[in-house]
Design a protein with these regions (language model features):
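Active-site neighborhood of HAD-like aspartate-dependent phosphohydrolases
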Residues: 17-67
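Helix-loop "lid/cap" segments that line or gate small-molecule binding pockets
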Residues: 51-52, 72-85, 141
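Asp-based, Mg2+/Mn2+-dependent phosphohydrolase catalytic module
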Residues: 3-7, 13-27, 63, 139-160
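Metal-dependent phosphoesterase signature
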Residues: 78-115
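Short, surface-exposed acidic
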Residues: 58-64, 84-93, 150
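Substrate-recognition element of Asp-dependent hydrolases with the DxDx(T/V) motif
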Residues: 48, 116-142, 155-157
């Protein structure tokens, strides 16, 4: 079985060549999507604000919603806004209503990421995407930003 290494890439042109040398014994490189390949802040926080607005909650500073980035949405609505299970499920539906149409395209690819992925592929690495985001959204984001061709596998969560 091949050695696997899960890495969170922080792109730095000066260190890229040195970093690949550190990974030379590995065949597969696993990347997360949010916070590693793309910055999801605008799409996620605007979609959370949209969901909260449905409940009469207005958020003026989207940065207040950054804690929603990463953990499961339902849990975040319960933790940060004391929603009931039913309210949290409805909030997730409202979130996805906006996110599936607009929010997923509001991601920003980190500068230099496409070049890093291209160089890794040229060096013979198999690139994999492992994300907690629903894989249907992850695949759409990668395709939208023309990054889908770099990854031989994209794995994420289901919509439930």
């Amino acid at each position: 079985m091949a050695d696997l290494l899960y890495i969170r890439v922080i792109y730095n042109k000066r260190r890229m060549k040195q970093s690949f040398n550190l990974f030379s014994k590995y065949q597969y490189l696993f990347f997360d999507l949010d916070g590693t390949v793309t910055d999801p802040m605008q799409g996620i926080t605007r979609s959370v604000a949209y969901a909260l607005n449905h409940f009469g909650i207005v958020v003026n500073d989207l940065r207040e919603l950054c804690p929603f980035i990463g953990p499961p949405l339902k849990d975040s609505f319960i933790e940060f806004y004391q929603f009931t299970e039913v309210q949290a499920e409805e909030a997730v539906k409202k979130y996805r209503e906006r996110y599936s149409e607009t929010g997923l395209y509001e991601n920003e690819v980190y500068p230099g990421m496409a070049e890093l992925l291209e160089q890794a592929r040229r060096k013979g690495y198999q690139l994999m995407m492992a994300t907690s985001k629903p894989d249907v959204f992850a695949k759409l984001i990668l395709k939208h930003f023309h990054l889908d061709g770099y990854f031989s596998f994209v794995g994420g969560s289901g919509l439930d």
